[in-house]
Amino acid sequence: MTQKKVAILGAGSWGTGLALVLADNNHQPVIWGNLDKIVNEINESHTNSHYLPDIILPTEVKATLSLDEAIDGAEIVVIAIPTNAMRIVCKQLNEALKEPTILVHVSKGIEPETNLRMSEVIEDEIDASKRKALVVLSGPSHAEEVALRHPTTLCASCKDLSAAEIVQDRFINNNLRIYTNDDVIGAEIGGALKNIIALGAGISDGLGYGDNAKAALMTRGMAEITRLGVAVGSNPQTFYGLTGIGDLIVTCTSVHSRNWRAGNMLGKGENLDEVLEKMGMVVEGVRTAKAVHGWAKKLDIDMPITESIYAILFENKDAREAVDLLMGREKKIEKESF
């Protein structure tokens, strides 16, 4: 395979993990970061100890503080940043891009102020003439396991399947299997909203409830995700795939999941400010819960689990009381509630 340069915007765990994959595939990954300490560590020690402790990076993984240097000559630009930084980074990228480029984003969330998905934010900020294609790379994955080269599957979603196939070709190897899909909306809705349900799974575990409770929460949570997704144009089949149920399972059941860990602390009685301070990293489900709270009301979508998690996060609702209220809701036929 011909070596290709790929720029990765974001020196966090996911950006670094994807850079490792590209280096394993004999490509030229360049990470753009904004902290001297992390950029220097990647270049000099071939580690990123804050985000991926105990992982040795291939020497082919390079990092820079210069956005221009990172994207110069890149076939693909991967945007691997927290959702709250998406607009400001895309404004910078729009100024820096000199020619149409394939853009890939791996950020899972909804913008609270606008209810826009991340691809819509990118389209808002980056001129169409500079976007060769926009691909969503998503699925059941923790960066830590990708960096350890454990078997993982993802889905590259794009309206232009030929662009999705290019991304598939650059990242696929014996450890990372990539599928393609044309349902961008479904991939983004599944990836964003599962973080809310993962907060709920953590809360359930923190309260000491068992597997039955978590299985119910995940299943009914997927019903809520599907309802909203279909209402905004997703293919319902997408939610049975990697970017739907797959991503939900891994995020609700793993100690690697920031959202599960945050929820677990909430379930044990800590308040949101304490939890976020202890986490020291972005917990996307908190921001997404705020966005979806208003969005679901606007669309008149019934999302009782999501609303309960919002109330625990932002209205000081007692978690046990929230569970009691959910369990006491009116009787329903299951198939009519999807």
From Swiss-Prot:
Pathway as given in its UniProt record: Membrane lipid metabolism; glycerophospholipid metabolism
GO biological process: carbohydrate metabolic process; glycerol-3-phosphate biosynthetic process; glycerol-3-phosphate catabolic process; glycerophospholipid metabolic process; phospholipid biosynthetic process
GO terms for cellular component: cytosol
InterPro entries: 6-PGluconate_DH-like_C_sf, 6PGD_dom2, G3P_DH_NAD-dep, G3P_DH_NAD-dep_C, G3P_DH_NAD-dep_N, NAD(P)-bd_dom_sf
Catalytic site: 194
Binding locations of sn-glycerol 3-phosphate: 108, 139, 141, 194, 247, 257-259
One Pfam family, short name: NAD_Gly3P_dh_C
Catalysis performed (reactions): sn-glycerol 3-phosphate + NAD(+) = dihydroxyacetone phosphate + NADH + H(+); sn-glycerol 3-phosphate + NADP(+) = dihydroxyacetone phosphate + NADPH + H(+)
Enzyme nomenclature, EC number: 1.1.1.94
GO molecular function, one term: glycerol-3-phosphate dehydrogenase [NAD(P)+] activity
Binding-site residues, NADPH: 13-14, 108, 143, 258, 282, 284
Subcellular location: Cytoplasm
UniProt keyword Hydrolase present: no
EC primary class: oxidoreductase
Function: Catalyzes the reduction of the glycolytic intermediate dihydroxyacetone phosphate (DHAP) to sn-glycerol 3-phosphate (G3P), the key precursor for phospholipid synthesis.
PANTHER family, sorted: GLYCEROL-3-PHOSPHATE DEHYDROGENASE (PTHR11728), GLYCEROL-3-PHOSPHATE DEHYDROGENASE [NAD(+)] 2, CHLOROPLASTIC (PTHR11728:SF1)
Family indicated by similarity: Belongs to the NAD-dependent glycerol-3-phosphate dehydrogenase family.
Protein name in UniProt: Glycerol-3-phosphate dehydrogenase [NAD(P)+]
Originating species: Listeria monocytogenes serotype 4b (strain CLIP80459)
